[in-house]
Design a protein with these regions (language model features):
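Conserved nucleotide-cofactor-binding alpha/beta core module
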Residues: 1-102
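Active-site capping/gating segments
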Residues: 87-137
Length: 137
């Protein structure tokens, strides 16, 4: 669990039923695993991130999308790392993105395919509250 690796974990789930079931599981584990209490969750459209708590040192996206959401890049801290599956619905590559901010405020992104082109993976598609897939926005 990420909660054992970080003081704060923020999780966004768009599927309400899945989020409610997960919340029940967390609550059932709190007595035995108090570190899970540092997980803050919300039901929302993850495309827009969680600006109230930004910037984030790390962002992990767990659904496939054909581009990197600009909102998530804005919420990534300087020298922060994002791991995100990017590509068409037929298969994505998992990118590791490091956000560098220079003294003058200019931003550069260092991108690396963590499998170096050797693997594509199909993730569940990134969806919006309207039900559209992110590539249809």
């Amino acid at each position: 669990m990420l909660s054992e690796l970080s003081n704060h974990v923020f999780s966004i789930e768009i599927v309400e039923e899945l989020a409610r079931e997960t919340d029940q599981i967390y609550r059932s584990l709190w007595d035995r695993f108090p570190e899970y209490r540092n997980v803050k969750r919300k039901i929302d459209d993850g495309y827009y991130g969680w600006p109230e708590y930004a910037p984030f040192d790390r962002i992990i996206v767990t659904c496939g999308i054909d581009h990197i959401p600009p909102e998530l890049l804005r919420e990534l801290a300087p020298e922060g790392i994002m791991v995100i599956p990017v590509g068409p619905p037929s298969g994505q590559t998992i990118l590791r993105i490091v956000k560098h901010v220079s003294a003058d405020g200019s931003v550069t992104l260092e991108r690396e395919d963590i499998y170096h082109g050797q693997n594509t993976i199909v993730f569940v598609p990134f969806t919006s509250k309207s039900g559209l897939h992110a590539e249809d926005r």
